[in-house]
């Protein structure tokens, strides 16, 4: 039944096609997580589908899960089958003769130590689980394969790794390659005595040749990353290739696939897709990263080959899903799976108004919120306005043709939507030897009283009064400036990986008041909060007034439209293994704060908050599991479920003319909740909820 396809996404849930990839349906929208790390179909009864939650590639934007799920009816209904504390699951293998036996490779969370890692097994269809392979609390199962001719033979790769907000370590004594010949009862670890590299190992990717299961490939991260091969079923190993062509960034990729009909044809899945026709001794590029016309996005994470027709393959990458029927000569991109990961969202005042936002690894875009055409909004109506990992977009309020767009590590451009022209305006320090620190998602904002005045955050606050052409520094270093957290050049562990994703001691939030000139709120990634009442001439550190964990990540600050002394602050600490939601409110310029959201109100950590600019009792909240609304000034919260999935809600904006709530999600693209005036009426008159019917003008 190859026309039935299931696709798991990093933070956009599970999708199903019954038409070979022509049409798609989201089938995992009501669960408590939208992050999918593994999918397995019971081939003897394809209506039985297993899903492991929590993506398995632990970059800085990683999403976690809450266990393993099972469906008996092709995804119409789901049952949680346990492993709730596993956080991230990367592989599921169903026994081909006895489907009650299922193996799960739990990679676990990189953000903290926990024992729910390693390889798990159930013998009763998920009712009970046994951990059958484990080394330590920082090591998880990065890969797991089964011999197709002998289901009692398993090969597992354990990976010792840890992530801090400011550093990543891959490799340690908990890593290793393990083989079991008795269905996981006992395991033997392979070592340098068997031909594997000496010393600590990092991430390992495994592949068994289906046509010749005695041939096994292992892509091993060590002091020198290399591809190893066994021709005796895993007893002895030999290094066959250590060139760059085998792959890169092992913490993020490390997947291999072998052609089911040809044991010498190997696909290495990484930034590119490289293929070997000689058993790994050499590779050629099947899909380069850029400069080709096949329309396939680079950065690949999932690869499937039809077991009977190796020309039919599917590729999952940072840009979506692609399908080929001719072994990579041509590709079809599935344009109807809306799983974009927005960091920020914005609107303009055109008619129809446009929605703007920056996406993880897919640039920054602009497109209409609605259209008067019968076909509705088409993908072609949207325009990429700048390249890179997209973050904040600030459309010019006076002329929507122009605006400012940010990308990773403090890059920013002036864009022209008509011509496509981009002009870089990244701030620099007047003393060239002074190094600026920009977060992966650096702070950027526009002054609400002077549209040509911009603010940008490094460790300093930068201000421009000429639209970004020139910049002045208007603050001291507002971070802790802790040197122990500024060693990003050493980040990566066995393989250096210094892309800027771990930049730390940086400014994340610059929030000017919309109703009082020169009032600025500042938040940093290392938990510092500052306030200026005079446009940056003087700064107050108000951090200790906030009852939050020391060093918590300041994700957002919202200055009130009703009271200049009032602001909302969103902090989260999941990067230090604390998922508690934290939203605070001050009404006295930061002298005191009250917590208005905690774990009794919502599920998961908080990401964004918005008080309605018209009705002060109406609040909206975005968390790791969705959208919440309060009608009573944040006293009580209700999850919004009608027409809206479980997903990360990263940012919120209100279009004032049309009273629309625009929602930027990290996994399900952007939504518009049309005309919230009825919600304002309910917040202003709570008794309306007791009326059986209420009409609104």
Predicted regions and their residues:
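Beta-propeller blade termini and top-face loops
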Residues: 1-697
């Amino acid at each position: 039944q190859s026309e039935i396809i299931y696709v798991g996404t990093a933070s956009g849930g599970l999708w199903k096609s019954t038409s070979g990839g022509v049409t798609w349906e989201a089938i995992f929208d009501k669960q408590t997580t939208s992050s999918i790390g593994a999918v397995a179909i019971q081939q003897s009864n394809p209506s039985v589908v297993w899903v492991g939650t929590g993506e398995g590639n632990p970059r800085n934007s990683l999403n976690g899960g809450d266990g393993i799920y099972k469906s008996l009816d092709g995804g119409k209904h789901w049952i949680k089958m346990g492993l709730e504390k596993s956080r991230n699951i990367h592989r599921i293998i169903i026994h081909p003769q006895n489907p009650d036996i299922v193996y799960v490779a739990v990679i676990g969370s990189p953000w903290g130590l926990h024992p729910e890692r390693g390889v798990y097994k159930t013998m009763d269809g998920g009712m009970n689980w046994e951990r059958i392979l484990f080394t330590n609390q920082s090591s998880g199962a990065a890969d797991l394969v089964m011999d197709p001719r002998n289901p009692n033979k398993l090969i597992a790769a354990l990976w010792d790794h840890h992530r801090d907000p400011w550093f990543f370590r891959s490799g340690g004594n908990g890593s290793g390659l393990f083989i079991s010949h008795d269905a996981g009862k006992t395991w033997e670890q392979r070592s340098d005595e068997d031909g594997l590299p000496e010393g600590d190992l990092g991430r390992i990717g495994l592949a068994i040749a289906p046509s010749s299961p005695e041939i096994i490939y292992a892509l091993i991260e060590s002091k020198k990353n290399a591809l190893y091969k066994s021709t005796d079923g895993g007893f002895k190993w030999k290094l066959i290739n250590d060139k760059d062509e085998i792959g890169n960034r092992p913490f993020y990729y490390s997947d291999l696939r072998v052609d089911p009909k040809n044991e010498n044809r190997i696909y290495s899945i990484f930034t590119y897709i490289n293929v070997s026709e000689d058993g790994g001794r050499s590779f050629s590029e099947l899909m380069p990263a850029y400069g080709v016309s096949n329309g396939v996005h680079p950065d690949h994470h999932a690869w499937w080959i039809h077991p009977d027709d190796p020309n039919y393959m599917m590729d999952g990458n940072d840009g979506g899903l692609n399908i080929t029927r001719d072994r990579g000569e041509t590709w079809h991109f599935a344009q109807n799976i809306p799983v974009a990961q927005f960091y920020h969202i914005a609107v303009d005042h055109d008619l129809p108004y446009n929605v703007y936002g920056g996406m993880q690894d897919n640039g920054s875009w602009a497109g209409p919120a609605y259209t008067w055409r019968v076909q509705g909004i088409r993908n072609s109506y949207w325009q990429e306005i700048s390249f890179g990992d997209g973050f904040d977009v600030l459309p010019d309020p006076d002329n929507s043709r122009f605006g400012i767009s940010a990308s990773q590590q403090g890059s920013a451009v002036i864009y022209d939507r008509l011509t496509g022209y981009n002009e870089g305006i990244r701030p620099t320090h007047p003393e060239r030897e002074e190094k600026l620190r920009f977060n992966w998602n650096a702070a950027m904002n526009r002054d609400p009283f002077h549209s040509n005045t911009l603010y940008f955050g490094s460790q300093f606050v930068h201000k421009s009064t000429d639209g970004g052409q020139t910049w002045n520094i208007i603050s001291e270093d507002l971070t802790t400036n802790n040197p122990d957290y500024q060693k990003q050049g050493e980040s990566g562990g066995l393989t250096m990986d210094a892309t800027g994703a771990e930049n730390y001691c940086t400014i994340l939030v610059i929030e000017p008041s919309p109703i009082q000139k020169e009032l600025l709120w500042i938040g940093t990634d290392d938990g510092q909060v500052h306030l200026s009442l005079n446009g940056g001439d003087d700064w107050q550190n108000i951090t200790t007034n906030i009852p939050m964990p020391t060093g918590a990540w300041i994700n957002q600050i919202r200055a009130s439209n009703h009271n200049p002394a009032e602001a909302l602050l969103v902090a989260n600490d999941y990067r230090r293994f604390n998922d508690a939601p934290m939203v605070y409110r001050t009404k006295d310029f930061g002298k005191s704060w009250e917590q208005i959201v905690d774990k009794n109100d919502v599920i998961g950590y908080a990401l964004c908050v918005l008080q309605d600019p018209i009705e002060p009792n109406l609040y909206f909240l975005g968390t790791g599991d969705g959208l919440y609304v309060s009608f009573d000034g944040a006293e009580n919260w209700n999850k919004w479920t009608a027409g809206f999935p479980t997903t990360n809600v990263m940012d919120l904006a209100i279009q004032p003319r049309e009273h629309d709530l625009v929602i930027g999600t990290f996994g399900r693209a952007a939504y518009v909740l049309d005309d919230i005036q009825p919600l304002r009426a309910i917040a202003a008159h709570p008794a309306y909820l007791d009326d059986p019917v209420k009409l609104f003008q």
